[in-house]
Amino acid sequence: MASHNSSDSTLDDTIMDGPAKLCGPKIFCIGAGKTGTTSLESLFKSLGFHVGDQERGELLLKEWATRNFAPIVSLGASAQFFQDMPFNCPFTFQAMDMAFPNSKFILSVRDDGEQWFGSLIRFHTKLIGKGRLPTAEDLRVFPYRYAGWILEALKLVYGVTDEEPYRKETLITAYERHNDEVKRYFRYRSESLLVINISDKGAAERIIEFVGLDYHDELMPHLNRSDDNV
């Protein structure tokens, strides 16, 4: 069992003190997919936070692309914790910061862009390509939110093309640019942003302290941090 005073626990063995009060600040996880957003969602659910409707958010991709933030702000008013698209897309964090003052932002990251790219490729190869790198046609017919949604997301958010939907340089550049823009935006407000690699020892303690919660020696449910599920 982990101890609050230890710096060795990760999101797998965090301890907590019951559910969080739902009257605190909103929390937006603005890291790219495959950086631990699923684990963070599980963490905040286990802490008692009201987690936003991910499907509803992902269906606002086209609104994000036209910078129509009104429906995204409306979704932001509906819960306390949010992750994945459109909240982790460029420009959304600024809109949420203005719409919901005193919110907390968590930028989840991997060790570097190469590691993030590898995780994305492995996940899509397993999920969509059934053992091979998906083609644009595979992405057009894959029924996630609707057929073609994943290809649209890759093109709109990361700037890839139909000809090269997994162009390494384009994807890594977009990933790193977003991270840099987030850190630059919050550079004078360290109380508002936590940059975290969830595989680091002590990550769970840092996250819980960042959102202002206390916890004691009660083991929290296991969180899956395998490479294919972050």
Regions found by a protein language model. Give the residues of each.
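The identity of the second residue at the extreme N-terminus of proteins
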Residues: 2-3, 230
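PAPS-dependent sulfotransferase catalytic domain
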Residues: 3-171, 181, 188, 192, 202-213
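Short, functional N-terminal and low-complexity linear motifs
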Residues: 7-10, 60-63, 145-152, 170-176
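Conserved short-loop catalytic and cofactor-binding motifs
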Residues: 28, 166, 170, 195
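The conserved 3'-phosphoadenosine-5'-phosphosulfate
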Residues: 56-64, 106-117, 138, 177-230
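Short, surface-exposed, charge-dense and proline/glycine-enriched linear segments
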Residues: 85-95, 136-145, 217-230
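Soluble or luminal CAZymes and related metallo-dependent hydrolases
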Residues: 85-88, 170-178, 199
